[in-house]
């Protein structure tokens, strides 16, 4: 029976781990994941989604601070894996780790490589308004998402997709793809297709400050940004309320062709939400927002409670 050590941390890899664990043709001697970390305002120490999944299936969990240390390498060698399957782990694997398995190391990546190598391929696909994206399983090498392609599959990006919804669908696709990849390896029919580096692009790790909305941009571009940054870091603007500049997070909008005003100007407030003008033409109807220190709510309720006036310009440095 093929021995597969699964290496991952985030929930993108959960469906893949579940699929391998439930497939009787493979055994998982261990799951390697990042150390438990404090999360949220309460700083409660919470195990990773991969650790929780592993424990549910009674799989031994190994949580090294550094997977490339001599001790970690020795521990993984002791497991005698045929394959490493890596997904959303959070550490770069050294050549010494990649050489441990008898067959090789596979990585499940949320894009159609060589497009969007790096940390944020799902957000990049939405921000760039791509019509399709997908998942690629590669044979790992020492580069960042540069290994030979074993298998890939695509799906359509919906105009309403957020990073959360697209993440979920790609994770499910990844699970189907890793099982097909393992089957191909078992049958001795697993290809190694070199990536075309001339077509490579990179999706760097997202920083919170990137989520500040520039209202001079096109309404479609702003809409894509809002969807790409939901649920994290969440697109935001600023609004002056009672003489104070506050941060307003924006979760959901509807593209409008009828907004006329300067970029960021509130041109209409009604039960449907807050209509804000964008650059070039048209605007966005804000539907779900969250003022700093408050709960997420319908934009109409926020406008009423904050006494937001038509003509207010969002994103202004100084009060009007």
Curated annotation (Swiss-Prot):
Cross-referenced Pfam families: Formyl_trans_C, Formyl_trans_N
Enzyme class: transferase
PROSITE patterns xrefs: GART
GO molecular function terms listed in the Swiss-Prot or TrEMBL record: methionyl-tRNA formyltransferase activity
Enzyme Commission number(s): 2.1.2.9
Positions that bind (6S)-5,6,7,8-tetrahydrofolate: 111-114
Reactions accelerated catalytically: L-methionyl-tRNA(fMet) + (6R)-10-formyltetrahydrofolate = N-formyl-L-methionyl-tRNA(fMet) + (6S)-5,6,7,8-tetrahydrofolate + H(+)
Keywords of this entry: Protein biosynthesis, Transferase
UniProt entry tagged with the keyword Transferase: yes
GO terms under cellular component: cytosol
Family label: Belongs to the Fmt family.
Function: Attaches a formyl group to the free amino group of methionyl-tRNA(fMet). The formyl group appears to play a dual role in the initiator identity of N-formylmethionyl-tRNA by promoting its recognition by IF2 and preventing the misappropriation of this tRNA by the elongation apparatus.
PANTHER family: METHIONYL-TRNA FORMYLTRANSFERASE, METHIONYL-TRNA FORMYLTRANSFERASE, MITOCHONDRIAL
Protein name, entry field: Methionyl-tRNA formyltransferase
UniProt source species: Methylacidiphilum infernorum (isolate V4)
Source lineage: Bacteria, Pseudomonadati, Verrucomicrobiota, Methylacidiphilae, Methylacidiphilales
